[in-house]
A protein has these predicted regions:
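C-terminal secondary-structure termini that scaffold catalytic or DNA-interacting sites
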Residues: 160-166, 171, 264-281
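Catalytic-site neighborhood detector that most strongly recognizes the C-terminal catalytic loop/helix
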Residues: 20, 95, 238-263
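Active-site/catalytic core of tyrosine-dependent DNA strand-transfer enzymes
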Residues: 170-208, 220
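Short, polar N-cap/turn motifs at the start of nucleic acid-interacting alpha helices
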Residues: 136-140, 229-249
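Basic, Lys/Arg- and aromatic-enriched nucleic-acid-binding interface segment
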Residues: 60, 64, 83-125, 129
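Short, aromatic/basic-rich helix-turn unit that serves as a nucleic-acid recognition element
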Residues: 2-31, 54-61
Length: 281
């Protein structure tokens, strides 16, 4: 290897030679740039430099993801082999009520179908953008979505999703998908962030409640868990690779859940349970 080779040259060469998905390649480049080594010479890299760069990242989830990037891209150099991959911190949300979420989503005439796909099918935003009427499968009286494609964040690549699978959806949502016209189908060059930006605009109006596609996917999982849907069904609906992911990342606990868990004395009022929502009505 040329002693004067720059990190950007080395990284792009490594990334192009490996079988990474398009979005993974984009994320890896972004991660390396984020720690300020992109224009440095490879010869100047050291384990201590990586440790200091990563240790300065305040967000633990970001630090974890960039550590994974560095260990992967610079694996052959051996300078990142001792970096520890820290545990991530699950995202938590103060979830609005179902009615409030519907009220917000319905304000978006252009993107409401995509947001409902996140909320009632647990899709990631790139997966929701890739859905077309051909994605709907009817088996008996049940409707399913085939999840086998996803748009990249920049809208330049339609590739395979993080996890391929089938998700059962309510009939009303299947009807909405079947009504998607050719003009409404997501086009190349449209960044999926358009939906996230639309969510920001929705949040600026009315109740000042902030929503985003990941929150809606989170609601989908949390709602099933709170309705005591068997965990293996939640795992399949979320298309997780194992049950640990389902329980660790998406089982959100609030103070109210602790209150419900407290034993009561005979003179105490029973703690009222939340309304049970039937997802498939």
């Amino acid at each position: 290897m040329d002693e004067t080779m720059l990190v950007n040259e080395y990284a792009q060469k490594v990334i192009s030679e490996r079988q990474y998905k398009y979005q993974t390649r984009q994320s890896y480049v972004k991660g390396i740039k984020a720690i300020g080594i992109w224009d440095m010479e490879v010869a100047s890299l050291s384990p201590q430099l990586f440790y200091e760069k990563l240790d300065s990242i305040p967000n633990l989830n970001t630090r974890r993801s960039i550590t994974i990037v560095c260990k992967s891209v610079f694996k052959d150099l051996g300078i990142c082999k001792d970096l520890k991959i820290i545990d991530g911190i699950p995202r938590t949300y103060d979830l609005p009520t179902q009615n409030v979420l519907h009220k917000l989503i319905d304000r978006s005439k252009k993107y409401s179908k995509y947001l409902y796909l996140c909320m009632y099918a647990g899709l990631r935003v790139g997966e929701a953008c890739a859905i077309t009427p051909k994605s709907v499968i009817k088996e008996g009286n049940s409707y399913w979505l085939s999840i086998d494609k996803a748009w990249s964040q920049d809208g330049q690549n339609l590739g395979s999703p993080k996890t391929i699978g089938k998700v059962m959806i309510p009939k009303w949502l299947a009807d909405q998908v079947l009504e998607i016209s050719d003009d409404e189908i997501w086009k190349k060059g449209m960044p999926t962030q358009l939906i996230s930006w639309a969510c920001c605009n929705l949040s600026k109006k009315g109740e000042k409640i902030h929503i985003n596609p990941h929150m809606l996917r989170h609601w989908f999982a949390t709602d099933m868990i709170r309705r005591q849907v068997p965990v293996h069904i939640v795992m399949r609906q979320m298309r997780h690779k194992n049950i640990n992911t389902t329980m660790k990342i998406y089982a959100q606990v609030h103070n109210s859940d602790f209150v419900d868990a407290l034993p009561t004395r005979p003179e105490d009022k029973a703690v009222s349970m939340g309304n049970v929502v039937n997802l498939f009505n």
